[in-house]
């Protein structure tokens, strides 16, 4: 007697039985799995719902971020399902947390389209964050294999070429954000750019939300900025620039503004993270083809990066943006007004600047990773910093960084040019002291170096007097799980 259709399609297998079975039994958990060099690895912080086994929660994340759905489907048998299933292979309790677990998951590289951050993220963070079996989920780190990294462009210009273009070595770069960020006319905006560059800064920049508003259209801003840049460059003999924000409603408009910036002589353009991954990669390709630096403002990142138990750790965003092709990205200051644990910030900077990563748990780096010759990305420190913190900034952040003093330049009592000069003199004094072997980070030595430099620089003395008591000494909400490192200005 012939079998019925349902009988013929019911496969007797541990991993295939019609209906709903646990993810761990479907093949999404494999404690004996051997990680391959070509695997994409992801580390998730999982908070299971009460009563949900952590291993099953990890398997559910692996399944829902790769091939699974809520029930077994017979079409799995038409694929290489054993290969394409993501494998949760390790679950560890999070230190000092009673209900959180680190879940390590491996993905076959063929699950992702080459050179497509949008496709990668559609799987890794696309649907699984709303899964009912978990009450919170955070993507903490990823390892992108060499073979997959090679399909990405990486930074359009990179640190080495940027320094060659600026002819500036062995010191951080100096910048400032034009303030107020909204409301200035084009003429006054250009004046701020000129004064800051003339006073000693390398860059001025637009802020994240200045695009093309009724009080100042983008062409007006671009033209006045370039006039200020050219005048300051002629006066100082240095290569100068201003980050022109080309973020817009459509990619057609983004390209139009980028082409115009190039035509009038700009060396750098700027975009916002809120543009989206496809837009960021698209303009990064344009920047590489047109020999333009590309600055990224991380606008919007704290909506998903700041909370410790849910969202995406910023270190992952750093990896994605380096892959996408930006040259600059805001990555924290340690001592400024924005969130920033010292060790976590150092981890972000290492991800952007090193060619190879080693496991460093206090820095929050969970995977070894070779960057496959992708160029290095310049971190930007911005938000509530001033020249009185120069010894701390150099100690924590090193040389390959843009130090952006917005209020710390434009808020100077003697004017914008004086504020820029104060920052330039403070930086050069501290770099010289460091190069001479002085213990500049010492709380007595560092401030004294600045006071000595201020004896021959009135603007620096004024700045030190004005901001000497200003600090943002708060405990970070996001700290490393393997070290106690509350943010402190010391």
Curated annotation (Swiss-Prot):
SUPFAM superfamilies noted in UniProt: RuBisCo, C-terminal domain, RuBisCO, large subunit, small (N-terminal) domain
InterPro entries xref list: RuBisCO, RuBisCo_large_chain_AS, RuBisCO_lsu_C, RuBisCO_lsu_C_sf, RuBisCO_lsu_fd_N, RuBisCO_lsu_N_sf, RuBisCO_lsuI
Gene3D superfamilies associated with the record: Ribulose bisphosphate carboxylase, large subunit, C-terminal domain, RuBisCO large subunit, N-terminal domain
Residues flagged as site, Transition state stabilizer: 337
Uppermost EC category: lyase
Cofactor note: Binds 1 Mg(2+) ion per subunit.
Chain sites annotated for binding substrate: 127, 177, 181, 298, 330, 382
Cofactor dependence: Mg(2+)
Binding site for Mg(2+): 205, 207-208
Keyword Ribosomal protein tagged: no
Gene Ontology BP annotations: reductive pentose-phosphate cycle
Record-stated family: Belongs to the RuBisCO large chain family. Type I subfamily.
Protein name: Ribulose bisphosphate carboxylase large chain
Source species: Thalassiosira pseudonana
């Amino acid at each position: 007697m012939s079998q019925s259709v349902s009988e013929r399609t019911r496969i007797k297998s541990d991993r295939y039985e019609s209906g709903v079975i646990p993810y761990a039994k479907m093949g999404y958990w494999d404690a004996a799995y051997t990680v391959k060099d070509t695997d994409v690895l992801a580390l998730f912080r999982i908070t299971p719902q009460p009563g949900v086994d952590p291993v099953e929660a990890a398997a559910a994340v692996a399944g829902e971020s790769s091939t699974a759905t809520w029930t077994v489907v017979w079409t799995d048998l038409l694929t290489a399902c054993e290969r394409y299933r993501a494998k949760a292979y390790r679950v560890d309790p999070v230190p000092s947390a009673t209900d959180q677990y680190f879940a390590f998951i491996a993905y076959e590289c063929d699950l992702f389209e080459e050179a497509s951050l949008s496709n990668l993220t559609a799987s890794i963070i696309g649907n699984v964050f709303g899964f009912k079996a978990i009450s919170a989920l955070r993507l903490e780190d990823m390892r992108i294999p060499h073979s997959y990294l090679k399909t990405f462009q990486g930074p359009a210009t990179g640190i080495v070429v940027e320094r060659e273009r600026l002819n500036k070595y062995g010191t951080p770069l100096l910048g400032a954000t034009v303030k107020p960020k909204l409301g200035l006319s084009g003429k006054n905006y250009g004046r701020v750019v000129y004064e800051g560059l003339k006073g000693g800064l390398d860059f001025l920049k637009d802020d994240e939300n200045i695009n093309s508003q009724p009080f100042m259209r983008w062409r007006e801003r671009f033209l006045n900025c370039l006039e200020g840049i050219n005048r300051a460059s002629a006066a100082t003999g240095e290569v100068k620039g201003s980050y022109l924000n080309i973020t817009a409603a459509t990619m057609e408009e983004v390209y139009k503004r980028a082409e115009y910036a190039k035509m009038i002589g700009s060396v750098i353009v700027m975009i916002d993270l809120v543009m989206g991954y496809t837009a960021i990669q698209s303009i990064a390709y344009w920047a590489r083809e047109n020999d333009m630096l590309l600055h990224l403002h991380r606008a919007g990142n704290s909506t998903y990066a700041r909370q410790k138990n849910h969202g995406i750790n910023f270190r992952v965003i750093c990896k994605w943006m380096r892959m996408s092709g930006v040259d600059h990205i805001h990555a924290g200051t340690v001592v400024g007004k924005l969130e920033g644990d010292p060790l976590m910030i150092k981890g972000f900077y290492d991800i952007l600047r090193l060619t190879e990563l080693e496991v460093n748990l206090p820095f929050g780096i969970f995977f070894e990773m070779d960057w496959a010759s992708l160029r290095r990305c310049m971190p930007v420190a911005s938000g509530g910093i001033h020249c009185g913190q120069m010894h701390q900034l150099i100690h924590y952040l090193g040389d390959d960084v843009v130090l952006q003093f917005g209020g710390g330049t434009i808020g100077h009592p003697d004017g914008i040019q004086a504020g820029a000069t104060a920052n330039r003199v403070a930086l050069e004094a501290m770099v010289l002291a460091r190069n001479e072997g002085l213990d500049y980070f010492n709380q007595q030595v560092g401030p004294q170096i600045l006071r000595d430099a201020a004896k021959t620089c009135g603007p620096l003395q004024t700045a030190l007097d004005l901001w000497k008591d200003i600090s943002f000494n708060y405990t970070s909400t996001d700290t490393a799980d393997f070290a106690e490192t509350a943010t402190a200005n010391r």
